[in-house]
Amino acid sequence: MGVVLLPPPLSMLMLVLMLLPAASASEAEHRLFQYLFEDYNEIIRPVANVSHPVIIQFEVSMSQLVKVDEVNQIMETNLWLKQIWNDYKLKWKPSDYQGVEFMRVPAEKIWKPDIVLYNNADGDFQVDDKTKALLKYTGEVTWIPPAIFKSSCKIDVTYFPFDYQNCTMKFGSWSYDKAKIDLVLIGSSMNLKDYWESGEWAIIKAPGYKHEIKYNCCEEIYQDITYSLYIRRLPLFYTINLIIPCLLISFLTVLVFYLPSDCGEKVTLCISVLLSLTVFLLVITETIPSTSLVIPLIGEYLLFTMIFVTLSIVITVFVLNVHYRTPTTHTMPTWVKAVFLNLLPRVMFMTRPTSGEGDTPKTRTFYGAELSNLNCFSRADSKSCKEGYPCQDGTCGYCHHRRVKISNFSANLTRSSSSESVNAVLSLSALSPEIKEAIQSVKYIAENMKAQNVAKEIQDDWKYVAMVIDRIFLWVFILVCILGTAGLFLQPLMARDDT
């Protein structure tokens, strides 16, 4: 099917006919604008009777909660202020203007209520009037200007980062009292239909209230509409980046008391934990308000943990001092033995390995028998070597039996700590001076070994006392860490239940 082409004159005629309604409507709006603002004064209140107030319907719509500055205690919000009133000077008949019922005009051309934010902290108190207002043929004026407000807000950081805040926004006319402007609240709360969710704060509720206040400066009564914005901080960021690392560091503090004293790294671990906590404390000081009225919850926890670590350093130094004590420097009191070696280990379910001493009586009996045999041997009947007639090659029965006895006795004596056995040997007058000197040396070695064993036992007792002290503070710090953490972080929950 081919395309039908109209003659050029006919095409021009149809184009003119299509543009006539648009041109006619534009002409109607132009005439309407001239009619409305020919004698209009944007300074005069739009009331027929000067004693009547202008009724202003007011509503705030929250678009975005931009930021809550805890340091400067400022809340920054993006709001739409909906204001509706009736201006009797801006009425017309739609039939006179080709059915035009609505018209948008610049806001600076008409009278507007001077609604301001009373608790503004920064920036302009009034909204920008560069937006247009919507006029209806009945005289109803609707003006919804957007604005970014920075309002002052008293922020209580006691339970930071699990805190709830109540920030108020007070709107009202700055120059018109109740007799000139009557504010009417639309709805019972802030409009949150177009609210863009914040990544740090959640809005619980935002009720609005109308107040009538008489200020000291004036005799008139002024109205205001105040919105109470109840917000809750989302603690996920602070939980992951602050609280959990602090919990882990506190757990490392507990492990200090489980680390053996011989390792030599106990104090190093304590100081490393203390430095880590100091870094965390420097980090959070930039995120909380600089106020001396209250200490935030996370600050209390870090302070608690820092005291915790400091005490662990002091206790660790004391434990190391006890661990390395010797009999030459310290004498263990009786009460220390009774408490730390007998009582507390049983209470703490600690078992200490005991050294085997069951062979001591048997060994002493054996050594006594050896000495008895040696004394009997000194009174033997052989007279060749005993009576001063020594053999030439030492192969006689007396010499051979004597060498065997002395060899066996010397070998056994080195494992004995009995002074009685050695003294019995020294009393043998039949032995030669060389044998007596050897036995005297063996006696010295035995006594020295006995003294070393006693000293080692005392050192082991001091080490065990240090181990008991470590175990006591291990459980004490575990309980304090658990109870302190639970007590601190359950406070916001209990405070919320009370309210």
From Swiss-Prot:
One of its GO terms (molecular function) is protein-containing complex binding. Expressed in neurons. Expressed in umbrella cells of urothelium (at protein level). The chain crosses the membrane at residues 245-260, 263-279, 302-320, 469-487. Na(+) binds at residue 265. Residues 261-262, 321-468 are cytoplasmic. It comes from the Eukaryota. The modification Phosphoserine is found at residues 407, 410. Residues 26-244, 280-301, 488-499 are extracellular. It catalyses: Ca(2+)(in) = Ca(2+)(out); K(+)(in) = K(+)(out); Na(+)(in) = Na(+)(out). Glycans are attached at residues 49, 166. Keywords: Cell membrane, Disulfide bond, Endoplasmic reticulum, Glycoprotein, Golgi apparatus, Ion channel, Ion transport, Ligand-gated ion channel, Membrane, Metal-binding, Phosphoprotein, Receptor, Signal, Sodium, Synapse, Transmembrane, Transmembrane helix, Transport, Ubl conjugation. Disulfide bonds join 153-167, 217-218. It is found in: Synaptic cell membrane; Cell membrane; Endoplasmic reticulum; Golgi apparatus. One of its GO terms (cellular component) is synapse. Neuronal AChR is composed of two different types of subunits: alpha and beta. CHRNA3/Alpha-3 subunit can be combined to CHRNB2/beta-2 or CHRNB4/beta-4 to give rise to functional receptors. Part of a complex composed of STUB1/CHIP, VCP/p97, CHRNA3, and UBXN2A that modulates the ubiquitination and endoplasmic reticulum-associated degradation (ERAD) of CHRNA3. Within the complex UBXN2A acts as a scaffold protein required for the interaction of CHRNA3 with VCP/p97, this interaction also inhibits CHRNA3 ubiquitination by STUB1/CHIP and subsequently ERAD. NCBIfam families: LIC. This is Neuronal acetylcholine receptor subunit alpha-3. It comes from Rattus norvegicus (Rat).
